[in-house]
Amino acid sequence: TLPDGQTLPIDFAIDGAGRCDITMTWQGERAEVPEFGLLFPLRRELTEVSYQGLGPRETTADRTAGGKMGAWNYNVRQDFAQNSPVYPQDCGSRTGVYSATVTGSIPGICFAGNGMTFSALPYTPHELENARHLYELPRDDNKTIVRCAAFQRGVGGDNSWGAKPHADACFAVEKGTSFRFTIQK
């Protein structure tokens, strides 16, 4: 969601081979935002992720020390089940991702960016935010939601009192801040 009165142009350039270059450029005033990226709903058959970036488990802007750069694989639904907390919340982000391919029983799709934040979950952020318990999540299991972002705010919580993320894990967009990535078969 954008701040009131703000717009965010998104340019798509598609070549003859079906490669789509996407560029988002912030036009507004300086603003602190929780993330700067796009979500893509994919068909439920696309559940296997292979990526090059920090892994093998989730990493965030303030939780990269345990990640190792490499080639990693995971199943979207199994990864959510292993990483989901007692109550639903956004999880499964991978940082420093240069390419991620989502495949399954149908032809897959590849997302490529320059060290982007990537996630693939069986639920939308809205569904996760509105469920207080795991059993309140939709049972239709009919989608995979991919996030490609230039950045996503860190999780914070250095202590048990719910500390906010440190300044280096929070991000502000300035006029002209852009994010470019590619989608292709």
Give residue spans per PLM region.
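Beta-strand/loop-rich accessory regions of lumenal/periplasmic or secreted enzymes
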Residues: 1-185
